[in-house]
Amino acid sequence: LAEQSPDVKVVILERGKDVLTKVRISGGGRCNVTHAEFLPSELVKNYPRGEKELLGPFHKFMTGDTIGWFEERGVALKIEEDGRMFPTSDTSESIINCFLKEAKEKGIEVKLNHAVQHIEKTEASWIVQTTKGTVIAKNLVVATGSNPKIWQMLQQLGHQLVPPVPSLFTFHNN
């Protein structure tokens, strides 16, 4: 978002004391970044759910784009025999550090320990109450993670949610 719209102020409200904790443990601590499949129609077949929802985004930003994005930022990726792609460093910290550096360069503000308590939509803005105060925003992007309280808040605002299934990352690999 910050890359596409540099004039927009982006604030991340993180419930926890640290960001990207699931990235840290993904792929056994190595962070399985993507899969070496370069056709969107083939890549989506490997997802046990979300095939329809992912096809459009994969046509806009695909495996090659992901590889290029990380390489432009100094993080080389490697392909393993089964097609999974990891940083050549074999540590998720390379990915985390890349994201944090990029966020800092783009002026993204990360507010830790800011658990969302209430979301309200007014005519002109969104009002988000957190454990540490109020944030008012013109636009709101919600990434709920595994927080059922947020799901309930979104439903109260009239959104329909697809029932969540616990997972860090799901990918069929034969």
Sequence positions of predicted segments:
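Predominantly flavin-linked oxidoreductase catalytic cores and closely associated redox partners
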Residues: 93-174
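Hydrophobic anchor at the start of a short beta-strand
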Residues: 8-10, 77, 140, 161
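An accessory alpha-helical subdomain
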Residues: 61-71, 81-106
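Glycine-rich FAD pyrophosphate-binding loop
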Residues: 2-28
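A short alpha-helix-loop-beta-strand transition element characteristic
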Residues: 19-25, 51, 55-62, 74-85, ...
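A generic structural signal for alpha->beta connector loops
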Residues: 7-9, 74, 107, 158
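An anion/pyrophosphate-binding glycine-rich loop and adjacent beta-alpha core
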Residues: 17-19, 24-25, 33-40, 160-162, ...
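Glycine-rich active-site loop/strand segments that organize a redox cofactor
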Residues: 30-79
